[in-house]
Every structure is written in C-alpha cells, then in structure tokens.
Design a protein with these regions (language model features):
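Glycine-rich, Arg-bearing micro-motifs that act as flexible, cationic patches
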Residues: 72-91, 113, 225-251
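Intrinsically disordered or low-complexity boundary/linker segments at protein termini
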Residues: 42-46, 69, 90-141, 145, ...
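Structural beta-alpha unit
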Residues: 8, 15-22, 26, 30, ...
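Active-site phosphate/pyrophosphate- and oxyanion-stabilizing loops and adjacent acidic/basic residues
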Residues: 37, 90, 131, 213, ...
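Short, ordered loop/turn segments at secondary-structure junctions
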Residues: 3, 75, 105-107, 151, ...
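A short acidic, glycine-rich active-site loop
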Residues: 17-30, 169-183
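Internal alpha/beta domain cores that form substrate/cofactor-binding pockets in large enzymes
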Residues: 46-65, 81-83, 87, 95-98, ...
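Small/aliphatic-rich secondary-structure junction motif
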Residues: 1-16, 113-170, 193-205, 261
C-alpha cells in the first residue's frame, strides 16, 4: 500500500479531481515498480494507492482491511534523521492497535530458524507480546529459537545505603543480587510458562545495564527479530511508545515487532 500526500484544494480546482487522481496513481505505480511488482504478485500481493493524511489513511485502511499485521519501514522520506522513528511510523502507531513490524536496515535471514527475542519488564505489555508470538507461531518459522530478555540496572559498587531508609543497615551485595534475581524471575515467569505449556523450547536472559542500550546491544549481537510491547512500567502511557521501547527501536538494527496492548 502506498499513500500519497494530499494536494491543496486550489490544485484540485485548477486541474480537476480526475487529473489529480491519475497523478497519484502514476506516482504510486513508480513506488511499486521499484519493489519488483511481478515477484510480489506471484506471492498474491495486491497493490493499492491512496491519498490523504498518511498515518490516518493507513490506520483507516488497516481497519477496513481487518489487517492482522502492519509492516513498514521506520523511516521514509523525512530528512530529519535525528528523530528516533519517522513521523509516519509514530503517527500510525498512535492511531492503530494492530501489531506493527518496523523494519530497519538489517533484513532478517530467510530461514525457519529465526532467533526471536521477547523483551519483557514484568508489565502486561510484555505478556501481550509473548501472547502474540504464541498465537502466530507460524510467522516465525518451525525451528525458531525463543529468548525472553529482561534488563536490570547494575548493582552499584560500593553497594549503596538501604533504599528504604538510609538509617537502616546497608544491603549487602548478596541481598541486592538476590533481589535482582527475584525481579528477573517475576518478569520472565509469566512468559516462560505459556511457551513451556505449548511445548516450545524457550530460555530466559538477564542483561545488566541501562535498559535502552543493554537491550539494543543484546539484540544487535544475538537476535534476528525483536518482539516487545509498546509500553512498560514507569512510562507515560499517553506517549506513542514508552521511552524504553522508543530508544530500543532507535538503537536496534533488527526488525522490531511492536505489540499495542488493548
């Protein structure tokens, strides 16, 4: 699907709606021609050219089409490369609950043994991401490897005073490590159990460091695709993506499947 920007009403009055529509169709056809349309058609892919506000139009078409998944690049023709995601990606994420696969420069290998990482923090959004994977198992290949990944802040050295009250005894490193393991277990358990119940092999991985960079670094080194919820604990829910999801999306080279929890 290709959506062309709307033209001013004065242009429509000057040239006529039919001429404008023809221009849109020709411009959209050029986009599809660059993709190799014959190869797409052989796979049952149909082409559609629309015009209007791009994010709004795509969201409305996804609703009409009853799309199960939206696939798009994270950046289009917008030259502001400093933005974490393209404006169209952000706008569409804000308007739809349909899961979105955001493609970066790194293309996943053509294999049925994808290395799939599910990022969780213990919130319902991580559980929703895992639920999507289990309900759409065929999308990832018969031999895919699944890893549930959780990030934890490093334990300070020397160990800081008791966080509840500085007048209480300082927590030992062993106590801090035990708490870190407990939080990790609580975060991954609700995701691990459904996979095991479905008879699927899954492992859990704890990465230590700033969540944004630690998760992205792990993904870039170990994963072919990332699945994550759009938000987690401590994020401003009115934002399109939570801060961690936004930064991971910006720093990760692999495709990211973002699940928008109902």
């Amino acid at each position: 699907m290709n959506v062309q920007y709307s033209v001013p009403e004065t242009i429509i009055h000057l040239f006529g709606m039919e001429a404008v529509k023809q221009y849109y169709l020709e411009a959209g056809k050029k986009v599809f021609d660059e993709l190799g349309p014959e190869a797409l058609r052989r796979r049952g892919v149909t082409e559609r050219v629309l015009y209007g506000d791009i994010g709004k139009t795509l969201a409305e078409e996804a609703e009409v089409f009853k799309a199960d998944l939206i696939v798009m690049g994270t950046r289009g023709l917008n030259p502001v490369k400093g933005l974490l995601l393209g404006s169209v990606s952000n706008d569409l994420l804000a308007r739809t609950k349909v899961p979105m696969l955001l493609l970066r420069d790194k293309t996943p290998p053509l294999t049925d043994k994808l290395r799939v990482g599910i990022f969780v923090d213990g919130s319902d959004y991580g559980a929703a991401a895992a639920d999507f994977v289990l309900r759409n198992r065929e999308l990832f290949g018969a031999k895919s490897e699944f890893t549930v990944v959780h990030a934890s802040a490093p334990i300070p050295d020397p160990v800081a005073p008791n966080p509840v009250s500085p007048h209480m005894p300082t927590l030992t490193r062993q106590e801090r490590e035990a708490e870190q393991r407990r939080v990790f277990a609580d975060a991954v358990k609700p995701v691990i159990e459904p996979f095991e119940a479905a008879g699927l092999a899954v492992k859990a991985e704890l990465v230590v460091g700033d969540a944004d960079h630690a998760l992205a670094d792990y993904a870039n080194k170990n994963l072919d695709i990332v699945v994550m919820g759009s938000h987690g604990y401590g994020n401003f829910k009115a934002a399109v993506l939570g801060s961690t999801a936004m930064h991971v999306a910006a720093l990760t080279e692999a495709p990211i499947l973002v699940i928008r929890k109902d």
